Swiss-Prot record:
EC number(s) reported in the record: 6.1.1.17
GO biological process, one term: glutamyl-tRNA aminoacylation
Reactions catalysed according to its record: tRNA(Glu) + L-glutamate + ATP = L-glutamyl-tRNA(Glu) + AMP + diphosphate
Protein's gene: gltX
Identification of the protein by name: Glutamate--tRNA ligase
Family: Belongs to the class-I aminoacyl-tRNA synthetase family. Glutamate--tRNA ligase type 1 subfamily.
Organism: Lactobacillus delbrueckii subsp. bulgaricus
Upper classification of the organism: Bacteria, Bacillati, Bacillota, Bacilli, Lactobacillales
Length: 500
């Protein structure tokens, strides 16, 4: 194996949206392949037809591309080891099923699901771990053939099970977990390798695929550890060398300390959700990569090239990786601050147009206005969709202040500051951020009010918010007429509250 070219695979099932955990698996395989100048294979594991979702494979491919992950072989681009969908490899699997049947390493099993469940219930009642019990125990070859013929005559469809040898230790040196081993009598007995509908089971198909596609390393989540001894059993039965395995820790919710559940709607954990927010793909890739992997140094912001250069599976954590939504938001925000402004403009404009705030084909003047708006809020955003809420004041009619805002400007000196500022703005012909800040300074000189007592009432009265971007830039984009309307409405509201 040491002399073989590095070939890894990401093999999703088309059963739903791309989860952050699966995205991490794809990223780690991608980084490992690129770091070692190897090959990344995309394989669609759609053998379980009952669980497949229509369009699921296409969705996986689209979201992987959005994350900036590309591959060298796959169902969309082909390659020398195809087909790359399990549903198109049924004849290949059948060849090896037949081989194991002929060699006596596998057999037809006719036990019904009802019989198997009754067997498991009995074992549980006896305090025994549920496992399959060989149904032909003590029978001769002729008796087995007769029993199978009778079952077929009744219309029963068989599965195919592989023999698990007794007293065998299945062990491997995991590049993440270290040395792992399982005794053959602890893995549930002879397991199914072909279902009643003729399709292979996961633990059989994955071995055939990995071997024939010459996969050198299998990097996957540690929920697959219990599958590995079963797969090693298939490798041994077929006389094949197994790849190197590396099992990455599962992801937990940092808030609860429990395994991240796909049903937990309080956490954004599907790549499609980030695409809908119109996040840049780089921070999603960064945050996914940092889940369970510690790079050299203190930096948490990397380019793709830096990630590829640094990636080493030896630095993968043996402890569960905590998914921290706030951390991901922070990483997104760091990228927003340095993102290409034209790219950011395109993304944010799309959000504003979707919300009906900007027309489909804005005139050059309006386009420049949107550019200034996006630049003004870039440092505050983690996702460009946030521009819709952040900039509402620029697209709505003047509204009354909230109770909290009124309480803030009911304090002494707020009204005099607002009245004087309105007078200073009245004098302005050139309504620019620089001139507006000059008007604020003039208000300070005329009233003697300064600091927070000056700036907070003016910010609230003009922008209808206690926080926000630079107040001069914000008012310039609003325009003088809108700002004056806000000031008039604020003074009216103060009068109604008895503040003169």
């Amino acid at each position: 194996m040491a002399n073989k070219k590095i070939r890894v695979r990401y093999a999703p099932s088309p059963t739903g949206h791309l989860h952050i955990g699966n995205a991490r698996t794809a990223l780690f395989n991608y980084l490992f392949a690129r770091h070692n100048k190897g090959t990344l294979v995309l394989r669609i594991e759609d053998a379980d037809t009952e669980r497949n979702v229509e369009g699921g494979a296409e969705s996986q491919i689209e979201n992987l591309h959005w994350l900036g992950i590309d591959w060298d072989e796959g169902p969309d681009i082909g390659g020398d080891y195809g087909p790359y969908k399990q549903s198109e490899r049924k004849d290949i699997y059948q060849k090896y099923i037949d081989q194991l049947l002929e060699e006596g390493k596998a057999y037809y099993s006719f036990k019904t699901e009802e019989e198997l469940e009754a067997q498991r219930e009995e074992q549980r009642a006896m305090g025994i771990a549920p496992h399959y019990v060989y149904e032909y125990e003590g029978m001769t070859t002729d008796e087995i053939k007769q029993a199978q013929a009778e079952a077929r005559a009744k219309g029963l469809k068989p599965v195919v099970r592989i023999h698990i040898p007794e007293g065998v230790t299945y062990e491997w040196d995991d590049i993440v977990k270290g040395h792992l081993s399982f005794e053959s009598d602890t893995i549930g007995g002879d397991f199914v390798i072909q279902k009643r509908d003729g399709m292979p089971t996961y633990n059989f198909a994955v071995v055939i695929d990995d071997h024939l596609m010459e996969i050198s390393h299998v990097l996957r989540g540690d929920d697959h550890i219990s599958n590995t001894p079963k797969q090693l059993c298939v490798y041994e039965a077929l006389g094949w060398e197994a790849p190197v395995f590396g099992h990455m820790t599962l992801i937990i919710n940092s808030a609860t300390g429990k395994k991240l559940s796909k049903r937990d709607e309080s956490v954004l954990q599907f790549i499609e959700q980030y695409r809908e927010l119109v996040s840049c793909q780089k921070p999603c890739s960064t945050s996914s990569s940092l889940l369970g992997w510690s790079p050299v140094g203190e930096s948490e912001i990397f380019s793709k090239r830096e990630f590829i250069k640094q990636f080493d599976p030896a630095r993968l954590s043996k402890s569960p990786a905590a998914f921290d939504q706030k951390k991901l938001d922070w990483v997104n925000n760091q990228y927003m601050k340095t993102a290409d402004r034209d790219e950011l403009l395109d993304l944010a404009l799309h959000n504003l147009q979707e919300a009906g705030l900007v027309e489909a084909n804005p005139a050059p003047g309006k386009m420049e206005w949107v550019r200034q708006l996006v630049n003004m809020y870039a440092n505050q955003m983690s996702y460009t969709k946030q521009i819709v809420d952040l900039s509402k004041i620029f697209f709505t009619e003047a509204k009354y202040l909230t109770d909290e805002e009124v309480e803030e400007i009911k304090k002494d000196e707020a009204r005099p500051a607002i009245e004087e500022f309105k007078k200073q703005l009245d004098k302005l012909d050139n309504f620019t951020a620089k001139k507006i800040m000059g008007a604020i300074m003039a208000t300070r000189r005329e009233t003697g009010i300064k600091g927070r007592k000056l700036f907070m009432p003016i910010r609230i009265a003009t922008t209808r918010s206690m926080v926000g971007p630079g107040i001069g830039e914000a008012m310039e984009l609003m325009g003088k007429d809108t700002v004056m309307k806000h000031l008039d409405l604020t003074l009216k509201q103060l009068s109604e509250a008895g503040i003169e």
